[in-house]
């Protein structure tokens, strides 16, 4: 499986530290190279002194596929350890984040909430817990072979409920979508679900801004997410 890593340069006179790390997930029809090619990620990450790991997940919806790779297990359980073995990445939960665009935003919810003690924050751009479109419904049988996800680790609403029970230890969530996005209704349903838990355990931020479903909106949303994540450069 392909994966791309972006590491900030060590500053002059600085010993090579273990970096804060963002796992950044691509959308349907994109790949592990899309973030570098289609956004200003490299400049944003350098500003925040942040390492970024971008795995490829094909069109899996970050699922353990019946007819394909086990992408949920790979990214949730295998990839972090492998990356830390090769690269100077922090092992601390407070230094580890996950985010994504479109299908990757759904994947960030799925993985981040299934492993809430692994990530301090989750970012979802242009997506929601349900991203059903004719294309994704048609692919579901290929991904799951009819296997129900309810009450499994990949049941996102159930993962939300379990993570919310952590109270102040639940990961923070930043969620944004364009007002002209075709996935807007699913994002609003997700907003309503996350806001239904008393006490705001996720310190949930939801923003709708002018824009459609595409990289122009995504680039600005990525910049805003990283600013929310780390307001001051490190």
Task: Label the model's feature ranges.
Residues 1-234:
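Non-catalytic cap/lid and distal C-terminal segments of serine-dependent acyl enzymes
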């Amino acid at each position: 499986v392909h994966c791309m890593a972006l590491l900030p340069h060590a500053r002059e006179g600085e010993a090579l530290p273990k970096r804060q790390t963002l796992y950044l997930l691509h959308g349907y029809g994109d790949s592990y190279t899309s973030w570098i090619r289609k956004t200003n990620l490299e400049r944003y990450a350098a500003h925040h002194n942040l390492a970024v790991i971008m795995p490829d997940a094909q069109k899996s919806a970050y699922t353990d596929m019946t007819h394909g790779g086990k992408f949920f297990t790979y990214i949730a359980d295998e990839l972090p350890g492998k990356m830390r073995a090769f690269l100077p990445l922090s092992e601390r939960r407070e230094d580890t984040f996950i985010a994504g665009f479109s299908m990757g935003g759904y994947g960030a919810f799925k993985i981040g909430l299934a492993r809430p003690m692994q990530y301090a924050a989750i970012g979802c751009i242009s997506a929601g817990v349900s991203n059903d479109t004719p294309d994704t419904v048609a692919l579901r049988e290929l991904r799951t072979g009819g296997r129900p996800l309810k009450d499994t680790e990949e049941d996102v609403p159930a993962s939300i409920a379990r993570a919310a029970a952590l109270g102040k230890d639940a990961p923070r969530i930043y969620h944004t979508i364009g007002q002209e996005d075709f996935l807007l209704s699913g994002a609003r349903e997700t907003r309503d679900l996350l806001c239904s838990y008393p006490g705001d355990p996720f310190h949930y931020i939801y923003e709708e801004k002018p824009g459609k479903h595409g990289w122009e909106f995504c680039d600005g949303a990525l910049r805003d997410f990283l600013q929310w994540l780390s307001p001051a450069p490190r």
